[in-house]
């Protein structure tokens, strides 16, 4: 009989011949296996170490022979039955009848039915003469089938690693329970090989396989429930658990920081699933003293508007919206022209971005539990959205200039740069505000970038072109002083002005300085001159 074709397939780093449907199930159910193993197929959960109880034969067969399997899938499942030993030989024969109904047959059927060792060895000799990978698989399969004891079977299974089929070897060792004290180091090497193969694309399963299941705390359980369909009760429970500082001493600065970033992470999670109502609920639930510690000084005053602004960007970067509509509320648009407010907003955004660090919570929990999109992809888009928000605030008034645009190497090509710039102009600089230094005005659409980034980079835009009047340009040091609220010292040497200001500042006691400058920092007024 002509040998069956034995292929090696790769699913997200998992190379396999014997268990392709197990690998495929793993690819689509990573989070289920890692965080809700009780709801996953027990065969898969057992292989990755999520559960201790071994699967039943039926649970294994459900993976080996899925419904509507084609002849190739059935033939591969029959190979796995032979490798799994005598307990599965009856299933091997029964599934051959199903294969016959599709006008196919397994190449080892006659030899296995009679268990004619000469026929089996003859097949093995012929397969060794062929140089292809599928012939090597057949040779190893025959040797596993003919092995006389557990030790010999283990050695033959290890030969699969020479074909980079470490995953198949690990599954067979696990199901056949071949690991013992003598071969523990070899099994560990195979396990590490599998971890290395899946680490990049399946980090949760790699972590599970390497470290085993961890005891899930209450916060992790709550985080694992999708927020998108949740009520405020779930968020309130999360906030209450995180804010429970009974075990945190007043002097534990690092633990307080950790608590802050956990709460910020919750705020981000609610926004990225477009549940801004839960974001507001979470803010109201956080105790005032903790909230003031998270967002000190000016930050607390602009917090809600900043979160609204960021929420709009999340919707665009996560493809929930195609336009930058209603990018910022009017109060935000008016406030952002103040240098100290911009500095405070950037502080909020930087903190929210840092809260995405995987070490904020004790266990790895995806940002959007149950999402079909990889957590790494989602995290990347969320970080890009926050980076975009920081860029908008930092480049306020010059967002269309060449220097500003060149700071967008991270920008997602799916988001039109032209539309972003236009939206900033509409949402932020179209508010009619006039005072002694700033004159915002709406400008014609044609003056913006025409959808061509290269064209914009070749053009040196003027402040008028991008909606900012010439009055924004600080022409001399006297005007800088007027903006900062200093008196006109134009007749005195600049050195004396600086000296006079410095001496007065030094005479102010520390508590007053903190009250005046809030969370911005006592030493930061001088360092922020670049914003003006």
Curated annotation (Swiss-Prot):
* GO terms, biological process: oogenesis
**What tissue specificity is annotated for this entry?**
Highly expressed in the germline.
Keywords assigned by UniProt, alphabetized: Developmental protein, Differentiation, Oogenesis
Task: Tell me which GO cellular component terms the UniProt record holds.
Answer: P granule
What is the role of this chain? Transient component of P-granule which is involved in germline development.
Source domain of life is: Eukaryota
Where in or outside the cell?
A: Cytoplasmic granule
The species this protein belongs to is: Caenorhabditis elegans
Predominant location = cytoplasm
Keyword NADP (UniProt): no
Known partners and oligomeric status: Interacts with pgl-1 and pgl-3; association with either pgl-1 or pgl-3 is not required for P-granule localization.
Gene deletion effect:
Viable, and not temperature sensitive. Triple knockout with pgl-1 and pgl-3 results in 58% of progeny arresting as late embryos and 5% as larvae at 26 degrees Celsius.
Query: What is this protein called in UniProt?
Result: P granule abnormality protein 2
């Amino acid at each position: 009989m002509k040998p069956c074709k034995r292929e090696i397939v790769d699913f997200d780093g998992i190379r396999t011949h014997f268990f392709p449907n197990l690998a495929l199930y793993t690819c689509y159910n990573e989070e289920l296996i890692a965080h809700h193993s009780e709801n996953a197929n027990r065969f898969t959960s057992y292989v990755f170490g999520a559960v201790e109880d071994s699967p039943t034969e039926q649970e294994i067969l459900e993976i080996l022979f899925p419904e509507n399997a084609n002849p190739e899938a059935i033939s591969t499942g029959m190979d796995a039955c032979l490798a799994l030993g005598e307990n599965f030989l009856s299933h091997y024969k029964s599934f051959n009848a199903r294969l016959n109904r599709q006008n196919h047959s397994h190449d080892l059927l006659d030899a296995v039915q009679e268990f004619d060792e000469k026929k089996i060895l003859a097949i093995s000799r012929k397969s060794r003469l062929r140089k292809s990978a599928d012939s090597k698989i057949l040779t190893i399969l025959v040797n596993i089938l003919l092995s006389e004891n557990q030790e010999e079977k283990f050695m033959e299974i290890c030969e699969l690693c020479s074909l980079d089929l470490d995953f198949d070897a690990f599954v067979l060792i696990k199901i056949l329970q071949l690991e013992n004290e003598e071969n523990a180091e070899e099994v560990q090497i195979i396990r590490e090989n599998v971890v290395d193969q899946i680490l990049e694309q399946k980090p949760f399963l790699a972590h599970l396989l390497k470290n085993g299941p961890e005891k899930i705390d209450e916060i992790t359980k709550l985080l694992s429930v999708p927020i998108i369909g949740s009520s405020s009760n779930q968020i309130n429970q999360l906030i209450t658990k995180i804010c429970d500082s009974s075990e945190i001493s007043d002097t534990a600065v690092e633990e307080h920081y950790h608590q802050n970033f956990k709460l910020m992470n919750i705020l981000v999670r609610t926004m990225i699933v477009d549940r801004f109502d839960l974001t507001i609920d979470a803010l109201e639930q956080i105790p005032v003293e903790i909230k003031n510690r998270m967002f000190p000084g000016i930050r607390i005053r602009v917090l809600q508007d900043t979160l609204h602004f960021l929420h709009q960007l999340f919707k665009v970067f996560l493809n929930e919206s195609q336009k930058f509509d209603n990018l910022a509320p009017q109060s935000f648009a008016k406030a952002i022209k103040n240098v100290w407010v911009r500095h405070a907003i950037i502080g909020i955004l930087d903190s929210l971005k840092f809260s995405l660090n995987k070490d904020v919570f004790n266990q790895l929990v995806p940002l959007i539990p149950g999402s079909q999109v990889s957590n790494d992809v989602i995290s990347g888009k969320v970080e890009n959205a926050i980076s975009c928000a920081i860029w908008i605030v930092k480049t306020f008034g010059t967002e269309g200039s060449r220097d500003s645009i060149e700071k967008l190497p991270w920008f997602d090509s799916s988001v039109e740069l032209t539309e972003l710039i236009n939206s900033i102009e509409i949402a932020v600089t179209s508010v009619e505000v006039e005072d002694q230094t700033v004159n915002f005005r709406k400008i014609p659409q044609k003056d913006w970038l025409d959808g061509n980034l290269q064209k914009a980079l070749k053009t040196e835009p003027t402040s008028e072109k991008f909606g900012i009047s010439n009055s924004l340009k600080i022409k001399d040091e006297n005007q800088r002083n007027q903006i900062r609220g200093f008196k006109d010292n134009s007749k005195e040497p600049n050195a004396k002005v600086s000296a006079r200001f410095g001496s007065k500042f030094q005479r102010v006691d520390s508590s007053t300085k903190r009250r005046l400058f809030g969370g911005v920092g006592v030493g930061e007024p001088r360092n922020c001159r670049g914003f003006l």
